[in-house]
Every structure is written in structure tokens, then in C-alpha cells.
Amino acid sequence: TITDLAENNQVPIIFFNRELVTEDLERWSELYYVGADASQSGVLEGEIAADAFKKNADIDKNGDGICQYVVLEGEAGHQDSIVRTEYSVNTMVEKGVETEKLGYAIANWNRAQAQTKMAALLTQFDGKTGQKCDVAVGNNDDMALGAIDALKASDIPKESWPGVVGIDGTDEGIEAVKNEEMLGTVYNDKEGQAREMLNLAFVIATDGDKSDIPLIDGKYVRTPYHKLTLENIEESE
């Protein structure tokens, strides 16, 4: 494997974006990960959805007090995708929202795939059975935007759209929040991660003092996520 080759040749590796499972990162002392905590992104996404559901009665399309939701998931087996889905849904429940999963689809982090998958999901929720989708949970902003594309292409009026939430805080995602097409997004501090990777790489390359690096367990550098909704979207500017 790459990690075996790196260890055999004494070449440290800094991983980012896609987090290795703990067992793999522990295989050698010079393997590091810089990124955000996927569980935190899921928690914050769940909080956005739960807060909106409790504050805005219009989100509960059939008025049953239950948040019927669909999930657009990233790559199958991707650690971040699994964690984001689990924590977003569990957080809604912990915030006192009763939930019902109507469906899910793997869209591989891709906007076009998400549009196709969301369009297929929407055909299942025409109200004839009393089931209507209240919230669409996207593992990232691109898939959330794909869900919005599907809603725009449907004959569903905007006031009847499900609430859509995403993760990453991309420029287009932030614009969708401003336009009230998304309930909110969870901002991923990519600039902070780039700085931390550079700092860590410099310290490793120069055999410097790692005490200046905010390492967790000697291997992880975490940058915090934060919520962006219409109430605080100006913070993104």
C-alpha cells in the first residue's frame, strides 16, 4: 500500500479531505490527517434542519408533526458520508424532532447525479398516501444544489418545496441560502485546513517543533465547522 511504501522509505504523509479509519492511520507514527470532524458537520446540519422544522410550521407539509426526510449520500463506503448521515439524522432526533426516513440515494457528491436521484425520489411523494418530503439532507452542498435543481425542474411550487440542507459552504451553496432555496449549509474551513497542512508540512520537513501544531493524539489537526443560515449568512462575506 501507499502507507507501507511511505514507511519503508521514511516519507511522512499528510492526508486531507478523506479521513482514514483510525487503524490505518495508527500503522505508522508519521501518518497525519488534517481536516474537519465529519461528526461535527453532521451534528450542525441536523441542528439546522431540526431548528427550521420546529420554528417553521410550513416545513411540515402534511402537518403530522413528523419530519419526513430523504438523504442524498456521497460515495458508498466513504467514511465522511457514513458519519455525516448518521449524525445529522441522530441530531434531529436528539433535538426533539420525530423523524421518518422516506428514502435515500447515493449521488457520489455530484450535483447532476443528485438532481437525477432527487427527481426519482420526488415521484414517490405526490401526497396521495399522505407522504410528503419535508427535508432533503445532502452530504454536501453540490448534492443539496442538485436536489434544488430537481425541485426547480418539477411542477412543485417553491412554497411547497422540502427544506434542503447541505455541508461545505461552497459559494453556490451560500448563494442558495441567501436566495432562501436552502435552509442552511455547514461551512468547511478549507482555507484554515490549507494553512494547517502547510504549517505541519514545514515542521516535518525542517524537523521543527511539533508543539506549535495543534495536533490531537499526535496525528490529527481539526478545523471547526460552523453553521450558515439566513440569520448569519453575512459572516460568509
Give the positions of each predicted feature:
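Exported/periplasmic ABC-transporter solute-binding proteins
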Residues: 133-135, 149-191, 195, 199-217, ...
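Hydrophobic alpha-helical
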Residues: 1-10, 87-88, 102-175
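Short beta-strand elements in bilobed, periplasmic/extracellular small-molecule ligand-binding domains
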Residues: 68-71, 93-111
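Short, solvent-exposed amphipathic alpha-helices that sit
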Residues: 41-45, 79-98, 113-117, 146-150
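Solvent-exposed loop/turn segments at secondary-structure junctions
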Residues: 19-23, 39-40, 75-79, 106-111, ...
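Hydrophobic alpha-helical segments within soluble ligand-binding/sensing domains
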Residues: 33-64, 114-115, 169-173, 189-209
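Flexible loop/hinge segments that line or gate small-molecule binding clefts
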Residues: 2-40, 44, 58-68, 170-178, ...
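Hinge/cleft segment of the Venus flytrap/periplasmic-binding protein
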Residues: 65-68, 72-76, 80, 91, ...
